[in-house]
Amino acid sequence: FILGCFFIGNTKCKGADLEYISQETANYAVQERGYDLPVDEVVKEEAIEDCKNVMNQMKAIYQKADKGTSSNVVVSETVMEEMQEVLKEKNVPVITSAPYSNMANYSKMEEFLFRAEQDLTGDIVLYRINRDGGIERLKFNYDGTDMYLLAVKAVWGMNDNPSIVYVSYTRIEEWKYTEKGWFGYTLCVPKYPEVSEAVDGSSMIRIKPLSDECREVSKRCVYL
């Protein structure tokens, strides 16, 4: 009887161990692929709440803006700049999706990147105002080895209330901050055979502001 109990108990322990090992292996596989990473619920809710609060700060500007007659709302560069003026009071980096838009409080973002280049840990939140009047909250975090991006996107929903479109947490595969002020990075993305078509995870953000003259020349000669 005693031996039987020992055998059953030992079998249960082995089963639990195998289940634990299987879960650890799955967690490792998720971390290795680098995308669709799990997000701590507290961190996630804080990011969502902050994103909604920021949207509400811009609500009056959005409501009075000329949004045209199309179902796909597009606000003017002037409206995006008004929103940027409001958000820059938070003393955080803010950009708009307008071509050659200068980043408000860019030195905060630059300081984070300079520290990361020296393998110093830190994080920074960057807000991007989109053409539909919504925003993206981009939180970059550097842990001393890898850089991660927690992205939250919000749009205007029913009755002009903020609505969260997505929350994603991704490891940045490679990144570089150039002498000319460009921050380029490539996110970890699904690859073949998981997907049949290539997914482009690359992005580039202008950090250092351009002079007014340079911006005007760029607008006339080049359009990104």
Describe each model-derived feature in a short phrase:
Residues 5-22:
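Sec-dependent signal peptide cleavage junction
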Residues 17-46, 50-53, 59-64, 134-224:
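Polybasic, proline/glycine-rich intrinsically disordered low-complexity segments
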Residues 17-130, 135, 224:
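N-terminal export/targeting and maturation segments
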Residues 1-3:
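Sec-dependent N-terminal signal peptides
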